[in-house]
């Protein structure tokens, strides 16, 4: 089961107050519902491929309105042969939709979120939970990027949902997609805050555990890469220095060098793997800084280049 599916399963088991149940139902029906007429009656179908969400809608409708609700199961005939669950409401569909602030006067569908429905902070959370159950997805925290989104068919609802989410300082943004609109989060911290707001506390803990391990692994990898790069740089410089010192030895002999250069040349030949700092601690005159050692080695490089190019050699 994917992380998103586990999160939704957790949410469908939450107990909610009556006011919050209406807010959650409103989001679920507004985003996944469709209306039709049968025998001069309004028929509401709420469709989902998630059995737990279908049970949630069925239970909330029965609890809030004590009406007859049908739960139908259909088999998809296309590539994804998942079951499709339809929660069907025939009895009192119109007054229920009006109570949930979905249906307005003259059978006009309200595409914005009603302020009356989300006056309380708990109801705002519940509407967001319903919206996530209806059209939400979230990447597994182990994947390369953090991403949570909620799909809406209509721009008005999408913008309204984005404003609602940002009342919780989630920094959500909107984007137009091919068949609708999304409100999305890209920051890991904001995704965990959203999971907390909608009540997915177990999923939040799992997300944070994975994120901490992942971030720590990335930090270690960056550190190792940095150390490896520095080591490669040190080894490369050491090999170049040894090659130049051997050239000097072959052409004029190390004894021709001033004492300070001769000593550091011999130390570099004998200890090719050590750092400049370690070389500075080996000189006979006492500890010398990295910059001091580097200055002497650069002088040896200059002498080697002068010998290669046939120039007169300056040993000072």
From Swiss-Prot:
GO process annotations (BP): cell division; regulation of sporulation
GO molecular function terms noted in the UniProt entry: DNA binding
Entry keyword set: Cell cycle, Cell division, DNA-binding
Role summary: Involved in cell division and chromosome segregation.
Similarity comment: family membership: Belongs to the WhiA family.
Keyword Cell cycle: yes
Entry-linked InterPro entries: Homing_endonucl (IPR027434), Sporu_reg_WhiA_N_dom (IPR018478), Sporulation_regulator_WhiA (IPR003802), Sporulation_regulator_WhiA_C (IPR023054), WhiA_LAGLIDADG_dom (IPR039518)
PANTHER family found in the cross-reference section: CELL DIVISION PROTEIN WHIA-RELATED
Keyword Cell division attributed: yes
DNA-binding region, residues: 275-309
Pfam families according to UniProt: HTH_WhiA (PF02650), LAGLIDADG_WhiA (PF14527), WhiA_N (PF10298)
Gene3D superfamilies registered for this protein in UniProt: Homing endonucleases
Descriptive protein name: Probable cell division protein WhiA
Stored SUPFAM superfamilies: Homing endonucleases
């Amino acid at each position: 089961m994917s992380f998103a599916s586990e999160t939704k399963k957790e949410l469908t088991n939450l107990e909610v107050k009556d006011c919050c149940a209406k807010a959650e139902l409103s989001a679920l029906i507004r985003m996944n519902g469709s209306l039709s007429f049968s025998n001069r009656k309004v028929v509401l179908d709420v469709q989902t491929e998630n059995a737990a969400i279908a049970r949630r809608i069925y239970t909330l409708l029965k609890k809030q309105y004590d009406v007859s609700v049908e739960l139908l199961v259909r088999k998809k005939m296309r590539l994804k042969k998942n079951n499709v669950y339809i929660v069907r409401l025939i009895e009192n569909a119109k007054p229920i939709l009006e109570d949930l602030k979905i249906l307005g006067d003259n059978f006009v569908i309200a595409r914005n979120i009603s302020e009356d429905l989300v006056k309380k902070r708990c109801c705002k959370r519940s509407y967001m939970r319903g919206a996530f159950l209806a059209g939400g997805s979230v990447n597994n925290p182990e994947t390369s990027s953090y991403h949570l989104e909620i799909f809406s068919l209509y721009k008005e609802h999408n913008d309204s949902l984005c404003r609602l989410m940002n009342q919780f300082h989630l920094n959500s943004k909107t984007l137009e997609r091919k068949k609708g609109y999304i409100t999305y989060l890209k920051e890991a911290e904001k995704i965990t805050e959203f999971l907390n707001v909608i009540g997915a506390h177990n999923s939040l803990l799992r997300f944070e555990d994975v994120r901490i391990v992942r971030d720590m692994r990335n930090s270690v990898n960056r550190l190792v890469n940095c150390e490896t790069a520095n080591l490669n740089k040190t080894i490369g410089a050491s090999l170049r220095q040894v090659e130049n010192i051997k050239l000097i030895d072959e052409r004029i002999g190390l004894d021709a060098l001033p004492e300070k250069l001769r000593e550091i040349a011999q130390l570099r030949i004998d200890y090719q793997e050590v750092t400049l700092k370690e070389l500075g601690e080996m000189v006979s005159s006492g500890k010398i800084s990295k910059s001091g050692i580097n200055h002497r080695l650069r002088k040896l490089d200059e002498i080697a280049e002068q010998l290669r190019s046939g120039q007169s050699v300056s040993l000072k």
